[in-house]
Amino acid sequence: MNFETVIGLEVHVELKTKSKIFSSSPTPFGAEANTQTSVIDLGYPGVLPVLNKEAVEFAMKAAMALNCEIATDTKFDRKNYFYPDNPKAYQISQFDKPIGENGWIEIEVGGKTKRIGITRLHLEEDAGKLTHTGDGYSLVDFNRQGTPLVEIVSEPDIRTPEEAYAYLEKLKSIIQYTGVSDCKMEEGSLRCDANISLRPIGQEEFGTKTELKNLNSFAFVQKGLEHEEKRQEQVLLSGFFIQQETRRYDEATKKTILMRVKEGSDDYRYFPEPDLVELYIDDEWKERVKASIPELPDERRKRYIEELGFAAYDAMVLTLTKEMADFFEETVQKGAEAKQASNWLMGEVSAYLNAEQKELADVALTPEGLAGMIKLIEKGTISSKIAKKVFKELIEKGGDAEKIVKEKGLVQISDEGVLLKLVTEALDNNPQSIEDFKNGKDRAIGFLVGQIMKASKGQANPPMVNKILLEEIKKR
């Protein structure tokens, strides 16, 4: 029997507001534990929440960027549950009137475009953070308690773990472009739970789902779903049934591990939040927020293809993060040729960032520095090989490309007299290579060029070396 995989994702995104959703407590990351909280966040008797307008507008902006319909009438509800990181014993969330519904984004997998529906986007407060010490104790930090969140729930339109990864990449990109969140999984500002089930191909009814939690990266989401897909298939083919469970992905064993069995859906006993009035969002407010949305990744990618003549793949890579796209545009504004700037960012820059596990903001390279180096290559002041030495200096220490070239004596040798001397020495020392070339072995030229570049410490002008070399061989 063949099965179809059905996946739905729930993504929590912390909003980058200056203060919390219902109090004036600040929201910096990494502050000393329990220093960024208040009696409102902790739910002391007699205190009342006040809704943060910026949080509402950030949620609206995110929902609009995800093609959601924005509610005119929306409200907040109490979600009741007990847990150590939830001091009020309830969370203020949205139940039946979310701020955004019926959205979608488009992903590309295997060269094919697919639309993934978004059921809803709702606004809520985050919980505190538990740290388990390993000696029987758990420590709780309430700094995060009350930080504004949006929960984005996808339709069960995702059919493969690869599609799930692509969906998360696209979702993160769009949210980052809006500026409402930095979406850093390592800091907890983007978190994801995945629901997965299998059903026989052709069957419309969904199978029993399992929920995957503690997914610390997009790669873990994909790996966890891949394992769970195989596990469920083996269970079903063995004649057993899938239990409704919550599981976690363990990277060490590369398996999903049972956390708890769920006998039914959770009953949070939602009821309208009595301390907050319903919220009315009129058309004027919607239009004002819509006008504040910047150019989104798909729009920027289309512009790069149409105006700069970039291949679709290059445009996609450059626009995946706003940080990279902005860096590219600033580099071009500083005088670099667009294609060269693109090549360096997709090549050497991305390779360095991946190897060091860093982002552009973490390195010393600036658009001015990269543009200056590219212009030196275009002018023939340095070769592409020398440029890699300059690039290493720029990305690790920063500075001005021209100044680095002069201080380190890296200017490309283009003086014909100097090059002729280098060519003559190479030919005198390698008579066999001359004979090999004359006998039709073109590789001999490559060897001779290599000897000349070695002698010049990589600074000889390659096109000029080739020209002089061929001329001198003819004379012998």
From Swiss-Prot:
<dbReference type="GO" id="GO:0050567">
    <property type="term" value="F:glutaminyl-tRNA synthase (glutamine-hydrolyzing) activity"/>
</dbReference>
<dbReference type="GO" id="GO:0050566">
    <property type="term" value="F:asparaginyl-tRNA synthase (glutamine-hydrolyzing) activity"/>
</dbReference>
<dbReference type="GO" id="GO:0070681">
    <property type="term" value="P:glutaminyl-tRNAGln biosynthesis via transamidation"/>
</dbReference>
<dbReference type="InterPro" id="IPR017959">
    <property type="entry name" value="Asn/Gln-tRNA_amidoTrfase_suB/E"/>
</dbReference>
<dbReference type="GO" id="GO:0005524">
    <property type="term" value="F:ATP binding"/>
</dbReference>
<keyword id="KW-0547">Nucleotide-binding</keyword>
<keyword id="KW-0648">Protein biosynthesis</keyword>
<dbReference type="InterPro" id="IPR004413">
    <property type="entry name" value="GatB"/>
</dbReference>
<dbReference type="InterPro" id="IPR017958">
    <property type="entry name" value="Gln-tRNA_amidoTrfase_suB_CS"/>
</dbReference>
<dbReference type="Pfam" id="PF02637">
    <property type="entry name" value="GatB_Yqey"/>
</dbReference>
<dbReference type="InterPro" id="IPR042114">
    <property type="entry name" value="GatB_C_1"/>
</dbReference>
<dbReference type="InterPro" id="IPR003789">
    <property type="entry name" value="Asn/Gln_tRNA_amidoTrase-B-like"/>
</dbReference>
<comment type="subunit">
    <text>Heterotrimer of A, B and C subunits.</text>
</comment>
<dbReference type="InterPro" id="IPR018027">
    <property type="entry name" value="Asn/Gln_amidotransferase"/>
</dbReference>
<comment type="similarity">
    <text>Belongs to the GatB/GatE family. GatB subfamily.</text>
</comment>
<dbReference type="InterPro" id="IPR006075">
    <property type="entry name" value="Asn/Gln-tRNA_Trfase_suB/E_cat"/>
</dbReference>
<keyword id="KW-0067">ATP-binding</keyword>
<dbReference type="Pfam" id="PF02934">
    <property type="entry name" value="GatB_N"/>
</dbReference>
<protein>
    <recommendedName>
        <fullName>Aspartyl/glutamyl-tRNA(Asn/Gln) amidotransferase subunit B</fullName>
        <ecNumber>6.3.5.-</ecNumber>
    </recommendedName>
</protein>
<dbReference type="InterPro" id="IPR014746">
    <property type="entry name" value="Gln_synth/guanido_kin_cat_dom"/>
</dbReference>
<comment type="function">
    <text>Allows the formation of correctly charged Asn-tRNA(Asn) or Gln-tRNA(Gln) through the transamidation of misacylated Asp-tRNA(Asn) or Glu-tRNA(Gln) in organisms which lack either or both of asparaginyl-tRNA or glutaminyl-tRNA synthetases. The reaction takes place in the presence of glutamine and ATP through an activated phospho-Asp-tRNA(Asn) or phospho-Glu-tRNA(Gln).</text>
</comment>
<keyword id="KW-0436">Ligase</keyword>
<dbReference type="GO" id="GO:0006412">
    <property type="term" value="P:translation"/>
</dbReference>
<dbReference type="InterPro" id="IPR023168">
    <property type="entry name" value="GatB_Yqey_C_2"/>
</dbReference>
